């Protein structure tokens, strides 16, 4: 008996498809409250931009040059984070992203690690800017060299 061929549209979960093809959060904020960037060994880069008010994450936008799986993961991080408190943001993990997507291919779990890593970098950047608010006017968002760290994410 022949092995069933994978049908992208029928075999992926609705959550995966919505996150992979949703681009409503795909944007760069000019003056983010927090910014993080990570590049994986696969070459994909994810940049995360946070809008936080009174300790609540109002919006999370992102930019990526990555594959459809990286887009799905970055979009999922944004979806899971919006409306949470800053402290609750740290509870978002690669496993929670994978669980939400349901059908992220196992060979692409590093995409979830990459997206969450960029999000954690943005949370840490927000925390730093809260301690040293004088730095915010000098933050360059997507050109911020301090966030341009290479991740050790494998293909």
Give the positions of each predicted feature.
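C-terminal binding/interaction regions
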Residues: 1-30, 35, 58, 84-88, ...
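Alpha-helical support elements that line or immediately flank enzyme active sites
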Residues: 69-84
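Short, thiol/selenol-centered motifs that function as redox-active sites or metal-ligating centers
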Residues: 64-73, 111
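A short catalytic or substrate-binding loop motif that flags glycine-/basic-rich loops and adjacent residues
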Residues: 29, 39-43
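Hydrophobic residues in beta-strands and at strand termini
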Residues: 52, 62-64
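Short small-residue beta-strand/loop micro-motif enriched in glycine and branched aliphatics
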Residues: 56-61, 71
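Short beta-strand elements
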Residues: 44-54
